[in-house]
């Protein structure tokens, strides 16, 4: 489906576009009070860089740590382990540090996407319960991202949807995160088989909003 429209100025076009696609909620006030630093490689590294930035007079209101769930080193470089649980080896004491940082006015932000690392327990659980997008042979559809394969949660399956939602509530919000980056909504393969039976070529562009 292709939809076209026009407006007298950018504001009108923006109103029409967000009326169609949905309007983003207002951002929290604290976001405008300083910078969010993108940091990775563990609790001690993050803590040290927050302190160094503050000593230099930088108003830090947040840290975005995409590797909170762990990392993997590949030929592509340092990459996130897509296992949406707190990696306590890389980030020891993170739960307590998040609370401490927040008291200092620094929020902790994380990262998540629709994939799950096939090496970890979350994938084993999802696969066993039929929560993954399938290929035409009825197997979990493994998509190669940069240098490694990963499975994708099938959000058209109500149980899978609730399970993934639970991961966010328990492992991210429950940990004390002030927000996160939601990535890779564009990767649904158009030759996949979905729980709902819908055509992935049709639902592809709706995937990020599900």
Question: What role is predicted for each listed range?
Answer:
Residues 1-210:
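Catalytic-domain carbohydrate-binding cleft regions of carbohydrate-active enzymes
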């Amino acid at each position: 489906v292709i939809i076209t429209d026009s407006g007298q100025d950018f504001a009108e076009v923006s109103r029409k576009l967000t009326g169609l696609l949905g309007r983003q909620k207002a951002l929290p006030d604290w976001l405008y009070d300083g910078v969010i630093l993108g940091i990775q490689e563990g609790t001690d590294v993050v803590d040290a860089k927050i302190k160094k930035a503050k000593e230099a007079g930088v108003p830090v209101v947040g840290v975005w740590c995409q590797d909170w769930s762990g990392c993997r080193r590949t030929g592509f470089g340092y990459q996130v382990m897509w296992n949406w649980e707190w990696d306590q080896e890389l980030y020891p004491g993170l739960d307590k540090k998040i609370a401490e940082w927040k008291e200092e006015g620094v929020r902790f932000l994380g990262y998540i996407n629709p994939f799950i690392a096939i090496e970890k327990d979350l994938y084993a659980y999802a696969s066993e319960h039929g929560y993954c997008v399938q290929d035409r042979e009825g197997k979990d559809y493994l998509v190669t991202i940069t240098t490694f394969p990963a499975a994708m949660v099938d959000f058209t399956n109500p149980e899978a949807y609730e399970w993934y939602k639970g991961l966010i509530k328990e492992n991210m919000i429950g940990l004390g995160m002030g927000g996160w980056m939601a990535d890779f909504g564009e990767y649904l393969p158009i030759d996949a088989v979905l729980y709902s039976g819908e055509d992935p070529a049709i639902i592809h562009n709706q995937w990020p909003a599900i």
